[in-house]
Amino acid sequence: MRVMNFSAGPSNLPDEVLKEAQEHLYDYHGKGFSIMEVSHRGKVFEEVHFEAIKMAKELYGVNDDYEVLLMQGGASLQFAMIPMNLYMGGVCEFANTGVWTKKAIKEAEILGVNTKIVASSQESEFDHIPQFEFSDNADYAYICSNNTIYGTQYKCYPKTKSPLIIDASSDFFSKKIDFSNIAMLFGGVQKNAGISGLACAFVRKDMIERSKNKNIPSMLKYSIYAENDSLFNTPATFAIYMFNLEMKWLLNQGGLDKINEQNIQKAKILYDVIDESNGFYKGHAKKENRSLMNVSFNIAHDKNLEPVFVKEAEENGMIGLKGHKILGGIRASIYNSISIEKVQKLSEFMKNFAKKHA
């Protein structure tokens, strides 16, 4: 019997996806070889690769103004690749809402980028998304749409004439997005759309043009990925195969609007328990910025009970609930593949735990 996995990532995968991958791990569609053994230049893998890209575009409904790039190195490599490819010598603006924006700012500064932090919520332990405006003449404006550690999430994206770059690693493929204001949307796929080792980026073609004249290594150049359909070198073939299965699974669930409905319902179940606990539990994020993906909270009644909560949860078949080492506390990551039923079981455990220890 499989446990209920509330880990922040790599995270829970849908049972249907795991079972299909298990079958194809040994014999791919009766061909006598594993999907892990196929050449990235062969017809079998090319079908998997291009189908994955097609489904990703279909899910978000993006037009041909965007290239879908599949790259190794996860989202963290993008912290360096973005300034390498898109910095034009002006200023790059950031909204600092957590660890991942801080890392993106640091990488840009290592590369000599003129950075400007237009807003930050660091003084309150990143418990909210601050109010701010980007200028309209930055080389790019940068946000992280969902902050995994602190449990905050943008409910709408800032409007700006500057190219808007969004790190969506932890709410990737969790809802429909209006791309009209977005120059680049990227993320590691290991939370909502696959396994670790792969980053997916939707990059507007005018941003691809910027990279063409950049004197940077080929493997770090967006235009090289675009010109070669993300097949310039041997890609992460198994991770792309898993990404393909996840895209198919999302479409079979009814697409991103349906997934978003379920995500809203799941988050409400847990936040209701927190809010109705008479102060036993306390959420970290301000209510207006609460994440649908990561529910971070403390046992305000007695923080010494938090390791007891995690231990007893594991004994009840629920893992991955220990908060990040930076923030501590408890965190339930309820990504796309976590069912409403599993969230309900966690909520019942939370209620019973509070009743027992109040």
From Swiss-Prot:
L-glutamate binds at residue 41. It comes from Campylobacter lari (strain RM2100 / D67 / ATCC BAA-1060). Pathway: Amino-acid biosynthesis; L-serine biosynthesis; L-serine from 3-phospho-D-glycerate: step 2/3; Cofactor biosynthesis; pyridoxine 5'-phosphate biosynthesis; pyridoxine 5'-phosphate from D-erythrose 4-phosphate: step 3/5. Belongs to the class-V pyridoxal-phosphate-dependent aminotransferase family. SerC subfamily. It is found in: Cytoplasm. Binds 1 pyridoxal phosphate per subunit. The keyword Cytoplasm applies. It holds the Pfam family Aminotran_5. Keywords: Amino-acid biosynthesis, Aminotransferase, Cytoplasm, Pyridoxal phosphate, Pyridoxine biosynthesis, Serine biosynthesis, Transferase. InterPro entries: Aminotrans_V_dom (IPR000192), Pser_aminoTfrase (IPR022278), PyrdxlP-dep_Trfase (IPR015424), PyrdxlP-dep_Trfase_major (IPR015421), PyrdxlP-dep_Trfase_small (IPR015422). The modification N6-(pyridoxal phosphate)lysine is found at residue 191. Its cofactor is pyridoxal 5'-phosphate. Its EC number is 2.6.1.52. NCBIfam families: PRK05355.1, serC_1. This is Phosphoserine aminotransferase. It catalyses: O-phospho-L-serine + 2-oxoglutarate = 3-phosphooxypyruvate + L-glutamate; 4-(phosphooxy)-L-threonine + 2-oxoglutarate = (R)-3-hydroxy-2-oxo-4-phosphooxybutanoate + L-glutamate. The keyword Magnesium does not apply. Its main location: cytoplasm. GO terms for biological process: L-serine biosynthetic process; pyridoxine biosynthetic process. It is an enzyme of class 2 (transferase). Catalyzes the reversible conversion of 3-phosphohydroxypyruvate to phosphoserine and of 3-hydroxy-2-oxo-4-phosphonooxybutanoate to phosphohydroxythreonine. Homodimer. Pyridoxal 5'-phosphate binds at residues 75-76, 100, 148, 167, 190, 233-234. GO terms for cellular component: cytoplasm. GO terms for molecular function: O-phospho-L-serine:2-oxoglutarate aminotransferase activity; pyridoxal phosphate binding.
